[in-house]
Amino acid sequence: FDENARFLEGTYVVGVLAKAFLDKNPAEAIVYDPRNILNTESVIAAAGGKATISKSGHSFIKQVMRENNAVYGGEMSAHHYFRDFNYCDSGMIPWLLVIELLSKSGKTEAPKKLSQLVDEMIAAFPISGEINFKLDGITAPAVLAKLEESYPQFDNQTATLDKLDGLSVNFP
Protein backbone atom coordinates (compact mmCIF):
# COMPACT_ATOMS: atom_id res chain seq x y z
CA PHE A 1 0.00 0.00 0.00
CA ASP A 2 1.19 3.53 -0.63
CA GLU A 3 0.71 6.55 1.64
CA ASN A 4 -2.84 6.98 0.28
CA ALA A 5 -3.81 3.41 1.23
CA ARG A 6 -3.81 2.44 -2.46
CA PHE A 7 -2.96 -1.22 -2.98
CA LEU A 8 0.14 -1.64 -5.12
CA GLU A 9 0.26 -4.69 -7.35
CA GLY A 10 3.36 -6.82 -6.90
CA THR A 11 4.73 -5.92 -10.33
CA TYR A 12 5.17 -2.29 -9.27
CA VAL A 13 6.81 -3.21 -5.96
CA VAL A 14 9.19 -5.52 -7.84
CA GLY A 15 9.98 -2.60 -10.16
CA VAL A 16 10.71 -0.24 -7.25
CA LEU A 17 12.93 -2.81 -5.54
CA ALA A 18 14.71 -3.75 -8.79
CA LYS A 19 15.57 -0.09 -9.33
CA ALA A 20 16.78 0.25 -5.74
CA PHE A 21 19.08 -2.75 -6.14
CA LEU A 22 20.38 -1.65 -9.54
CA ASP A 23 21.13 1.84 -8.20
CA LYS A 24 23.50 0.15 -5.72
CA ASN A 25 24.60 -2.76 -7.93
CA PRO A 26 24.73 -1.64 -11.58
CA ALA A 27 24.50 -4.32 -14.27
CA GLU A 28 23.46 -7.04 -11.81
CA ALA A 29 20.87 -9.69 -12.64
CA ILE A 30 17.31 -9.35 -11.38
CA VAL A 31 15.02 -12.41 -11.51
CA TYR A 32 11.25 -12.09 -11.89
CA ASP A 33 8.29 -14.29 -12.76
CA PRO A 34 6.32 -14.06 -16.04
CA ARG A 35 3.46 -12.13 -14.45
CA ASN A 36 5.86 -9.21 -13.88
CA ILE A 37 7.18 -8.98 -17.39
CA LEU A 38 6.45 -5.55 -18.94
CA ASN A 39 7.04 -3.13 -16.06
CA THR A 40 9.89 -5.14 -14.59
CA GLU A 41 11.78 -5.53 -17.87
CA SER A 42 11.40 -1.81 -18.55
CA VAL A 43 12.73 -0.82 -15.12
CA ILE A 44 15.66 -3.24 -15.34
CA ALA A 45 16.60 -2.10 -18.85
CA ALA A 46 16.42 1.59 -17.88
CA ALA A 47 18.65 0.93 -14.86
CA GLY A 48 21.19 -1.09 -16.87
CA GLY A 49 20.51 -4.43 -15.20
CA LYS A 50 20.20 -7.94 -16.59
CA ALA A 51 16.55 -9.05 -16.78
CA THR A 52 16.22 -12.78 -16.07
CA ILE A 53 12.84 -14.48 -16.17
CA SER A 54 11.94 -17.58 -14.15
CA LYS A 55 8.94 -19.79 -13.59
CA SER A 56 6.81 -18.66 -10.65
CA GLY A 57 7.51 -20.24 -7.29
CA HIS A 58 10.23 -19.92 -4.70
CA SER A 59 12.20 -23.01 -5.74
CA PHE A 60 12.37 -21.87 -9.38
CA ILE A 61 13.18 -18.25 -8.51
CA LYS A 62 15.94 -19.25 -6.07
CA GLN A 63 17.48 -21.68 -8.56
CA VAL A 64 17.57 -19.08 -11.35
CA MET A 65 18.94 -16.48 -8.93
CA ARG A 66 21.81 -18.81 -7.97
CA GLU A 67 22.51 -19.72 -11.61
CA ASN A 68 22.76 -16.01 -12.51
CA ASN A 69 24.18 -14.70 -9.21
CA ALA A 70 21.17 -12.37 -9.11
CA VAL A 71 21.10 -9.73 -6.41
CA TYR A 72 17.28 -9.78 -6.14
CA GLY A 73 14.30 -11.84 -7.25
CA GLY A 74 10.67 -10.79 -7.06
CA GLU A 75 7.30 -12.37 -7.71
CA MET A 76 3.93 -10.80 -8.44
CA SER A 77 2.69 -12.57 -5.30
CA ALA A 78 4.83 -10.20 -3.18
CA HIS A 79 7.53 -12.74 -2.41
CA HIS A 80 10.98 -11.16 -2.52
CA TYR A 81 14.31 -13.01 -2.45
CA PHE A 82 17.75 -11.59 -1.73
CA ARG A 83 21.22 -12.87 -2.59
CA ASP A 84 22.66 -11.31 0.56
CA PHE A 85 19.98 -13.08 2.62
CA ASN A 86 21.00 -16.50 1.27
CA TYR A 87 18.31 -16.26 -1.43
CA CYS A 88 15.60 -16.42 1.23
CA ASP A 89 12.22 -14.74 1.10
CA SER A 90 11.66 -11.85 3.48
CA GLY A 91 8.74 -9.56 4.13
CA MET A 92 10.74 -7.17 6.27
CA ILE A 93 13.61 -6.40 3.88
CA PRO A 94 11.36 -4.97 1.11
CA TRP A 95 9.71 -2.36 3.30
CA LEU A 96 13.08 -1.38 4.79
CA LEU A 97 14.45 -0.92 1.26
CA VAL A 98 11.43 1.17 0.26
CA ILE A 99 11.89 3.38 3.33
CA GLU A 100 15.59 3.76 2.47
CA LEU A 101 14.73 4.63 -1.12
CA LEU A 102 12.18 7.23 -0.02
CA SER A 103 14.60 8.79 2.47
CA LYS A 104 17.35 9.06 -0.16
CA SER A 105 15.00 10.64 -2.69
CA GLY A 106 15.11 13.94 -0.82
CA LYS A 107 18.90 14.33 -0.91
CA THR A 108 19.18 15.98 -4.33
CA GLU A 109 15.54 16.82 -5.06
CA ALA A 110 12.25 17.19 -3.27
CA PRO A 111 11.45 14.05 -1.25
CA LYS A 112 9.26 11.58 -3.12
CA LYS A 113 6.33 9.62 -1.86
CA LEU A 114 5.82 5.96 -2.71
CA SER A 115 2.86 6.89 -4.91
CA GLN A 116 5.16 9.09 -7.00
CA LEU A 117 7.60 6.22 -7.50
CA VAL A 118 4.91 3.93 -8.88
CA ASP A 119 2.53 6.34 -10.68
CA GLU A 120 4.69 6.44 -13.81
CA MET A 121 4.90 2.63 -13.83
CA ILE A 122 1.13 2.32 -13.41
CA ALA A 123 0.49 4.77 -16.26
CA ALA A 124 2.96 3.04 -18.59
CA PHE A 125 2.03 -0.54 -17.71
CA PRO A 126 -1.53 -0.83 -16.34
CA ILE A 127 -2.51 -4.33 -15.30
CA SER A 128 -5.80 -6.06 -14.64
CA GLY A 129 -4.52 -8.19 -11.82
CA GLU A 130 -4.85 -11.94 -11.92
CA ILE A 131 -8.04 -13.18 -13.54
CA ASN A 132 -9.21 -16.76 -13.03
CA PHE A 133 -11.90 -18.66 -14.89
CA LYS A 134 -13.83 -21.82 -14.08
CA LEU A 135 -14.05 -24.06 -17.13
CA ASP A 136 -17.20 -26.08 -17.67
CA GLY A 137 -17.22 -28.83 -20.29
CA ILE A 138 -13.65 -28.27 -21.47
CA THR A 139 -10.24 -28.96 -20.00
CA ALA A 140 -7.54 -26.38 -19.37
CA PRO A 141 -5.11 -28.14 -21.76
CA ALA A 142 -7.74 -27.97 -24.54
CA VAL A 143 -8.22 -24.23 -23.97
CA LEU A 144 -4.46 -23.64 -23.96
CA ALA A 145 -4.08 -25.64 -27.19
CA LYS A 146 -6.77 -23.53 -28.88
CA LEU A 147 -5.14 -20.30 -27.69
CA GLU A 148 -1.75 -21.52 -28.84
CA GLU A 149 -3.21 -22.24 -32.25
CA SER A 150 -5.17 -18.97 -32.54
CA TYR A 151 -3.09 -16.12 -31.13
CA PRO A 152 -0.11 -16.23 -33.50
CA GLN A 153 -2.57 -15.47 -36.31
CA PHE A 154 -3.32 -12.05 -34.81
CA ASP A 155 -1.35 -8.88 -35.52
CA ASN A 156 -0.16 -10.03 -38.96
CA GLN A 157 1.23 -13.22 -37.46
CA THR A 158 3.88 -11.39 -35.42
CA ALA A 159 2.83 -12.73 -32.02
CA THR A 160 5.25 -15.09 -30.31
CA LEU A 161 4.40 -17.76 -27.78
CA ASP A 162 6.22 -18.44 -24.53
CA LYS A 163 5.56 -21.64 -22.58
CA LEU A 164 7.98 -21.03 -19.69
CA ASP A 165 5.19 -21.00 -17.11
CA GLY A 166 1.84 -21.68 -18.73
CA LEU A 167 1.15 -19.86 -21.98
CA SER A 168 2.08 -16.26 -22.71
CA VAL A 169 1.45 -14.49 -26.00
CA ASN A 170 3.76 -11.59 -26.76
CA PHE A 171 2.95 -8.93 -29.31
CA PRO A 172 5.72 -6.65 -30.64
Named regions from a protein language model:
Residues 25-172:
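Phosphate-binding and adjacent anionic-ligand microenvironments
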Residues 1-12, 40-41:
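Short Gly/Thr/Asp-enriched flexible loops that form oxyanion-binding sites at enzyme active sites
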Residues 19-23:
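A short, N-terminal amphipathic alpha-helix
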Residues 14-16:
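Extended, compositionally biased non-globular segments that define protein topology
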